[in-house]
Regions:
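Glycan-recognition and processing domains
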Residues: 18-60
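A short beta-strand element within beta-rich, extracytoplasmic domains
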Residues: 65-80
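Short, well-structured beta-strand segments within conserved domains
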Residues: 69-73, 102-134
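Short, surface-exposed beta-strand/strand-loop-strand elements in extracellular ectodomains
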Residues: 81-92
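Serine-esterase "nucleophile elbow" of acetyl-processing enzymes
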Residues: 115, 140-214
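Oxyanion-hole/transition-state-stabilizing segment in secreted/luminal serine hydrolases
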Residues: 168, 217-278, 303-305
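Catalytic His-Asp segment of secreted/periplasmic serine-dependent ester chemistry enzymes
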Residues: 216, 303-383
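Active-site segments of SGNH/GDSL-like serine hydrolases
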Residues: 260-269, 284-318
Length: 383
């Protein structure tokens, strides 16, 4: 402003800087799927959570007064080709690439009020996952100024689903990889509706004695020699608590209500020694029972294995699985919480039909056909 030839400064009130809120991974508003995430300090730490498991999830709850809310999930993966899918207040955004930096802006926020974001690790290349080179890392959720966290519901009784490429959703999206199209996800939604949480620990190429990932970097579930996977989340993080029990987050008293084991396909495809597989099954069941004394354990005969059009040697491996579980039960007659479930040859032939995929990996319709059968098998065992 100019007055009598003198330039006077304009008096202006500075606008306050925008102060976005970032919820850390330790926020009460956040919850991570049990038994599948490692932290920056063992199972915990205040900085980050990471997982290589497709099908793992995290959920965030908050409320905002803003008519134009924003949210950005602080997630990265250094390996190209990985993706997540998320549900915002029930609406699905599918197949979102995970960047090497910068996180993912959440689409669809359009109104004030309470919001819930559930993020699923959808797919990643089957390589370098065990040592964290190919892992999703989450450091928080950044929200608009004025947003406030709201508490996430506590962990409920939970179910651990273990398996191979079929369980992690390879080719499940009608030829494309997606953990949201596989039976494990669908069984998980049924478990949620029945009042349970769930988690998926699955790796392609793996089995009772077969290592996982294309180059074999993920250990077999329990080989007779070498590194085991049953009691680890990744190469550096144990799945057990201080007592040696399976634990959702590392605390005592967090054992799963049930475990479903779906292995044997890769042993069959690779002509693995059936006696070695049998011994591994017995060792797995013995170890799991020691680490989860009251948990319902179900060994599932891989549902397609009886179809000799796809698995010429399938019946021999089915026989080996039956024999292994029978041998364990004979040695542990008081353990009535460990069973084998065989859905039978009709289910196998259905999965082998072209409409359901017609091969080793079912398509979405095949997984949808399979899911209620497996869900019933799991729920029928839980008191």
């Amino acid at each position: 402003m100019v007055l009598m030839g003198v330039v006077l400064p304009l008096c202006m009130t500075a606008l306050p800087a925008r102060a976005d809120l970032t919820l850390p991974v330790t926020s009460p508003a956040a919850r991570f799927s049990p038994a599948t995430w490692a932290g920056d300090a063992g199972r915990g730490g205040a900085v980050s959570r990471r997982t290589w498991n497709n099908g793992a999830w995290c959920v965030w709850h908050w409320s905002t007064p803003s008519p134009h809310p924003t949210a950005r999930l602080q997630i990265t993966n250094q390996t190209p080709g990985s993706a997540v899918s998320y549900f915002l207040d029930g609406a699905l955004t599918d197949d979102v690439p995970v960047p090497a930096s910068g996180g993912i802006p959440i689409a669809g926020l359009a109104a004030p009020g309470p919001h819930t974001l559930t993020v699923y690790t959808r797919n990643s290349p089957q390589t370098d996952r065990w040592r964290g080179t190919n892992a999703y890392t989450v450091t928080g959720l950044t929200l608009d100024d004025g947003a406030k966290p709201t508490p996430a519901p506590p962990l409920r009784h939970w179910v651990l689903i273990v398996g191979d490429s079929i369980t992690e959703g390879i080719q499940a999206d009608d030829g494309r990889d997606s953990s949201l199209c596989d039976y494990a996800f669908l069984v998980g939604q049924g478990l949620n509706a029945a009042g349970f949480d769930y988690t998926v620990s699955a790796c392609g190429y793996s089995g009772w004695v077969r290592p996982g990932d294309a180059q074999g970097d993920v250990p077999a579930y329990l080989p007779l020699l070498g590194v085991q996977r049953w009691n680890m989340i990744d190469a550096d993080t144990r799945l057990l608590d201080s007592r040696g029990h399976l634990s959702a987050y590392g605390g005592i008293g967090q054992e799963p209500a049930a475990i479903l084991l779906n292995y044997g396909v890769n042993e069959c495809l690779n002509h693995s020694d059936k006696a070695a597989m049998r011994d591994s099954v017995i060792s797995v069941l013995t170890a799991l029972r020691r680490a989860a004394p009251r948990t319902e354990i179900t060994v599932l005969v891989p549902p397609g294995l009886a179809d000799t059009r796809i698995y010429p040697n399938g019946p021999a491996y089915i026989t080996a699985l039956h024999a292994a579980v029978a041998a364990y039960q004979a040695a542990h007659p008081d353990d009535r919480k460990t069973v084998l479930v065989d859905l039978g040859p009709d289910v196998a032939r259905a999965l082998g039909s072209p409409a359901y995929g017609g091969g080793v990996h079912p398509h979405a319709a095949g997984h949808a056909y399979l899911a209620p059968l497996i869900l019933q098998a799991v729920l029928s065992r839980i008191p």
